[in-house]
């Protein structure tokens, strides 16, 4: 093995095998030195060697060790030559490893001296099941060169079979060979993950094999199987376990196969012999290629180096000639404090000026861990481009074009107003980093059509395609056609497909003549018809039909979009896009990703579907009713979403569910949260309304329609650089904690999901004549947020432990009567003394939920209840054709008896249970009863219901004028108990002009779970205890927040008048 280091250098002349020195030699002749030519070249304090350049030959020398007892002499005459003078230093050998005398000698003295760490490797790295690779102690590791040193191998063999004795004990002969025999006797039918070679193998042999593909962005292996192969495209189809399909090229991916040796022999497969790292780079080959380059003391243009910029990892780059930069701003500034180098990075193709000390040779960087410190996909591309440069000494086409067109790029960037640093980014210590923004043309000639750029397939609008053609955004082509001024001459026309800046969803076709005149239209034919009409006017009267046939071509044909080759290219462009949201996260080598940098979708499981998705409030008003999307079931206020007309039970869909919405759900440009109430922005993107409300720089152009969202481009640059502390995604704009001394950042919707947002705080201190209310939006991090009584989900519900009967002591009877006590007429619904409440609370500890199910003659015991839970009853899903509120209401009335059942509740009395699973947003049941006035309801409660001992009062207040009395009439909905953490909520809906109180599912409700909702009992003088048993229980049924707000008098200052004494 060859090892290189900068610590110690010695000069060694190689054995002269030819009469004249040669510049390049076979790598095998260099590393395959006879054992008689081994030299002892150990130095004190280091065992890593590096050879200097000998004349024109610059090849790395392998490290040799002198082994005691091996019979190898360093003073052999074969090492001498007339052309090369051998200077051998024989320093004293330093023992770097020591063992106690009583312990047996290790298997190999060489391993004893330099190998102390052993780790197992996979089958794909070497063609052996139980082989071990050894790591050397020191500042640098042994670098594999693709072949083992013959000299070191012979040393190991001599030590293994020499039978040397130490301390009276001899090693058993052939022990290593026996261990190797055991390793080779592994089961031939056992399957292991291996890497296979693709050279000389039938492509169909891989079909049916189980594989796993490495995704660099996720740093994970995803398992699947090979299900097909396209010979025309030379791509394999991989079907992952999650059901996603993807077409990949084996040479561009990191793939392992689960096969056995028998299957490999049957399918004629071979192991991958090259040493490939986890990043997919052929490390050994790059080391050999870099070692064959001449290493000079000074760097010259064209040399490949490792360059270091402040704040970035070591990156492969090529030194660029100073003459190509011209008048480029930023790069023509010399770095102070020494010499500088102008480099261009592989992969990113950026230009930079760095100091000389910040660049090291490529071979030194490979031998150090520089290539292992970066896992970015661009770095992988850069390493592949660097490898191709080492092989063919030719730069990638884009790098060459950027170097040749440096002047044009510089002029474009100098005139750009988007770059705030005159085309360059200034770094520390005078470094300059320039990112080229010029798009490199993709040139493809088809007949007289020159395609410059294929563009990209648009997925967020359905207007960029029709039944026969696809119009990629950014498509650019050129062709020669009859001139506008002279029909006998030809002119060059440039054709482009862009996005209309006004509609943001429709394409705009532009044809530019050589004179600079542009013809725009919504279709290709609209543009070319204008050109045809112009040419016809210029034609002479004596030859009107000369160009008649040429002027009849369709606009699509002139653009080239109807050409079969162009159609195939566009189809391949659309097929190259991943087919699922999981595949969209992948960023492989050689692929261009449409996802913005740092983006990762965040999905929030909202627990409060009864609240508005915009303002996050659950109050509903007469002039601001709730609207629920009949497709995605999102809940918003009508005014919060900009809906001016009531739907009255008709079908209502949000912007993303309506016909004409984007095919793929758009992502918010302000946060990575998926879904929610979104509106278009003025620049053609989408954003959440909640994000636009919380971010200070954004606003709404039309407050009534709540769209479009404006000010996205005015958001502070520092806000885009913040990383959310909740989701950990660096994409989007973040807000910070409202505490003056806190700088914790998070996305608005992430903070809302975590309970960090204080939605509204009224500020009535208005100045001047305007009386508009100002609302402060406050949010606090976990450290500074106020103590909240927010309840946990139903999965965190705590079941009370059942007490033993012997531990229960009944309260003392103050009257002394052993049987009864007088009825307390001042109490409501029976006894309200503390003793009675304590007895009732203790009694509930023994109560279990027991739904009433008709099942013949059988006792409903606890075991029967468990069997009900375990029974497999098919879930009743709402039919997909039912969308409108009226249809859902009709379906709920017809099926609620099949879906719900009453029974004994563990909370209080009887309750309602779900016989089938329900989804969030489903209509559960309607609360029906007798509609009375509030005054009638109060009299009935005081005069009739309070005198009925053991009976409950079931009143549902709709508003200040209407109350539903379900005590003696109505459905079983009045049996639904209260809970501080409910799984349902109540809403008033309007169907065909009539109002109905509906109980909706707030979340997914499993089978046989009890239905609960928040009563929000409002009473200033009376308190009702709660027995829901949740950790966040308020302790009372009363709506404490509403009572506190009612106790405060809040009046705007504009409504106040000066008091004058009468």
Swiss-Prot record:
What the entry lists under SMART domains is as follows: FYRC, FYRN, PHD, PWWP, SET
Domain annotation PWWP: ranges: 301-365
Task: Give the source's domain of life in one word.
Answer: Eukaryota
Q: Which residues form the SET domain?
A: 898-1016
CC terms in the record's Gene Ontology section: chromatin; cytoplasm; nucleus; perinuclear region of cytoplasm; plasma membrane; Set1C/COMPASS complex
**Consequence the record notes for mutating residue 1013 to A:** Deficient methyltransferase catalytic activity associated with early-flowering phenotype and reduced WRKY 70 and LTP7 transcripts levels but normal recruitment of WDR5A at target genes but without histone modification
Residue pairs linked by disulfide bridges in the UniProt entry: none
Residues that bind S-adenosyl-L-methionine: 908, 954, 977-978
Zinc finger residue extent: Phorbol-ester/DAG-type:
591-647
> Residue limits of the FYR N-terminal domain?
441-500
Q: What is the effect of changing residue 1015 to A?
A: Deficient methyltransferase catalytic activity associated with early-flowering phenotype and reduced WRKY 70 and LTP7 transcripts levels but normal recruitment of WDR5A at target genes but without histone modification
Q: What enzyme class is recorded for this protein?
A: transferase
Q: How is it modified after translation?
A: Activated via O-glycosylation by SEC; this modification triggers FLC locus H3K4me3 histone modification, thus preventing premature flowering.
Report keywords, A-Z: Abscisic acid signaling pathway, Chromatin regulator, Cytoplasm, Glycoprotein, Metal-binding, Methyltransferase, Nucleus, Repeat, S-adenosyl-L-methionine, Stress response, Transcription, Transcription regulation, Transferase, Zinc, Zinc-finger
Region Disordered: start-end pairs? 159-184, 401-424
What EC number(s) does its UniProt record assign?
2.1.1.354, 2.1.1.-
Output the Gene Ontology terms for molecular function.
chromatin binding; histone H3K4 trimethyltransferase activity; phosphatidylinositol-5-phosphate binding; protein methyltransferase activity; transcription cis-regulatory region binding; zinc ion binding
The segments annotated as C2HC pre-PHD-type zinc fingers are: 665-698
Pfam families per the UniProt record, alphabetical: FYRC (PF05965), FYRN (PF05964), PHD_2 (PF13831), PWWP (PF00855), SET (PF00856), zf-HC5HC2H_2 (PF13832)
Sequence similarity:
Belongs to the class V-like SAM-binding methyltransferase superfamily. Histone-lysine methyltransferase family. TRX/MLL subfamily.
Q: Write down what this protein is called.
A: Histone H3-lysine(4) N-trimethyltransferase ATX1
What is the native source organism of this protein? Answer: Arabidopsis thaliana
- Encoding gene (name): ATX1
């Amino acid at each position: 093995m060859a090892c290189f280091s900068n610590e110690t250098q010695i000069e060694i002349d190689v054995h002269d095998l030819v009469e004249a020195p040669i510049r390049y030699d076979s790598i095998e002749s260099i590393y395959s030195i006879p054992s008689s030519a081994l030299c002892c070249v150990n130095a004190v304090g280091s065992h890593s060697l590096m050879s200097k350049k000998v004349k024109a030959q610059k090849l790395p020398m392998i490290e040799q060790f002198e082994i005691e007892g091996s019979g190898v002499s360093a003073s052999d005459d074969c090492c001498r030559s007339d052309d090369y003078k051998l200077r051998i230093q024989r320093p004293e050998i330093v023992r770097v490893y020591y063992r106690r005398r009583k312990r047996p000698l290790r298997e190999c003295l060489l391993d004893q001296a330099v190998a102390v760490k052993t780790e197992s490797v996979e089958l794909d790295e070497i063609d052996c099941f139980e082989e071990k690779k050894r790591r050397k102690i020191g500042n640098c590791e042994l670098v594999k060169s693709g072949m083992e040193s013959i000299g070191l191998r012979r040393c190991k063999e001599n030590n293994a079979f020499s039978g040397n004795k130490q301390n009276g004990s001899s090693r058993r002969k052939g022990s290593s060979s026996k261990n190797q025999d055991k390793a080779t006797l592994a089961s031939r039918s056992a399957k292991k993950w291996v890497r296979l070679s693709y050279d000389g193998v039938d492509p169909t042999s891989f079909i049916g094999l189980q594989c796993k593909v490495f995704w660099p962005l996720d740093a994970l292996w995803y398992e699947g199987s090979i299900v097909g192969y396209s010979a025309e495209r030379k791509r394999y189809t991989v079907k992952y376990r999650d059901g996603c399909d993807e077409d990949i090229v084996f040479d561009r991916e990191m793939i392992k196969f689960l096969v056995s040796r028998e299957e490999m022999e049957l399918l004629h497969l071979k192991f991958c012999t090259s040493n490939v790292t986890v990043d997919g780079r052929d490390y050994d080959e790059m080391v050999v290629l870099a070692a064959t380059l001449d290493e000079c003391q000074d760097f010259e243009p064209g040399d490949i180096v490792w360059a270091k910029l402040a704040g970035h990892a070591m990156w492969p780059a090529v030194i660029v000639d100073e003459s190509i930069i011209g008048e480029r701003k930023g790069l023509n500034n010399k770095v102070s404090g020494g010499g500088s180098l102008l480099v261009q990075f592989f992969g990113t193709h950026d230009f930079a000026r760095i100091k000389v000390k910040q660049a090291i040779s490529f071979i030194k960087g490979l031998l150090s861990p520089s290539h292992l410190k970066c896992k970015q996909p661009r770095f992988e591309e850069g390493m592949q481009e660097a490898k191709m440069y080492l092989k063919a000494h030719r730069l990638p086409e884009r790098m060459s074009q950027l170097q040749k067109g440096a002047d044009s790029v510089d002029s474009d960037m100098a005139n750009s107003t988007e770059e705030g640093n005159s085309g360059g980014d200034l770094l520390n210590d005078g470094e300059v980093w320039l990112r080229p923004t010029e798009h490199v043309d993709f040139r493809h000639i088809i007949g007289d059509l020159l395609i410059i750029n294929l563009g990209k397939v648009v997925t967020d609008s359905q207007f960029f395609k029709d039944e026969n053609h696809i119009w990629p955004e950014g498509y650019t082509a050129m062709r020669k056609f009859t001139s506008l001024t002279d029909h006998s001459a030809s002119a060059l026309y440039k054709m482009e497909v862009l996005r209309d800046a006004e509609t943001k969803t429709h394409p705009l076709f532009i044809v530019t003549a050589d004179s600079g005149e542009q013809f725009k239209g919504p279709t290709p034919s609209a543009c070319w018809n204008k050109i045809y009409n112009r040419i016809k006017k210029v034609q002479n009267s004596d030859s009107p039909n000369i160009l008649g046939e040429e002027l009849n071509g369709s606009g699509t044909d002139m653009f080239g979009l109807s050409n079969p080759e162009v159609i195939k290219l566009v189809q391949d462009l659309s097929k190259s896009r991943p087919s699922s949201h999981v595949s969209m996260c992948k960023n492989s080598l050689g692929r261009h990703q449409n996802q913005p940098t740092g983006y990762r979708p965040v999905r929030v499981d909202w627990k409060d579907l009864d609240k508005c998705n915009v303002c996050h409030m659950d109050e509903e008003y007469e002039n601001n009713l709730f609207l629920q999307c009949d497709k995605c079931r999102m809940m918003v206020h009508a005014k919060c979403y900009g809906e001016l007309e009531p739907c009255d039970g008709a079908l209502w869909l949000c912007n993303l569910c309506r016909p004409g919405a984007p095919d793929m759900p758009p992502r918010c440009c302000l946060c990575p949260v998926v879904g929610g109430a979104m509106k278009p922005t003025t620049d053609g993107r989408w954003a959440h309304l909640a994000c636009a409300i919380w971010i200070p720089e954004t606003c709404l152009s039309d407050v009534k329609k709540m769209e479009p969202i404006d000010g996205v481009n005015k958001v502070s640059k520092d806000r885009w650089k913040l990383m959310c502390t909740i989701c950990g995604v660096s994409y989007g704009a973040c807000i910070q904690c409202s505490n003056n001394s806190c700088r914790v950042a998070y996305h608005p919707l992430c903070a809302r999901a975590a309970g960090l947002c204080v939605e509204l705080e009224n500020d009535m201190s208005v100045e001047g004549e305007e009386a508009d209310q100002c609302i402060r939006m406050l949010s606090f991090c976990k450290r500074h947020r106020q103590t909240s009584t927010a309840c946990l989900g139903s999965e965190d519900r705590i079941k009370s432990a059942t007490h033993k009967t012997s531990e229960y002591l009944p309260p003392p009877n103050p009257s002394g009567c052993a049987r009864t006590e007088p009825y307390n007429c001042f109490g409501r619904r029976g006894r309200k003394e503390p003793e009675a409440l304590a007895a009732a609370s203790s009694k509930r500890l023994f109560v279990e939920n027991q739904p009433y199910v008709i099942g013949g003659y059988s006792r409903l015991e606890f075991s029967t209840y468990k069997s009900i839970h375990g029974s497999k009853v098919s879930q009743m899903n709402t039919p997909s054709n039912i969308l409108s509120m009226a249809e859902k209401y009709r379906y709920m009335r017809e099926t609620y008896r099949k879906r719900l059942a009453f029974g004994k509740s563990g909370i209080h009395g009887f309750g309602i249970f779900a016989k089938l699973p329900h989804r969030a947003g489903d209509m559960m049941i309607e609360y029906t009863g007798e509609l009375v006035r509030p005054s009638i309801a109060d009299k009935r409660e005081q005069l009739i219901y309070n005198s009925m001992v053991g009976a409950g009062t079931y009143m549902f207040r709709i508003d200040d004028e209407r109350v539903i009395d379900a005590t003696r009439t109505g459905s079983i909905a009045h049996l639904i108990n209260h809970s501080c953490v409910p799984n349902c909520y109540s809403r008033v809906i309007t169907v065909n002009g009539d109002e109905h109180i509906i109980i909706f599912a707030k979340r997914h409700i499993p089978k046989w779970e009890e239905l609960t909702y928040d009563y929000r009992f409002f009473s200033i003088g009376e308190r009702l205890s709660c027995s829901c048993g949740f950790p966040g229980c308020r302790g009372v049924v009363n709506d404490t927040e509403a009572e506190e707000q009612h106790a405060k008098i809040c009046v705007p200052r504009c409504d106040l008048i000066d008091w004058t004494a009468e």
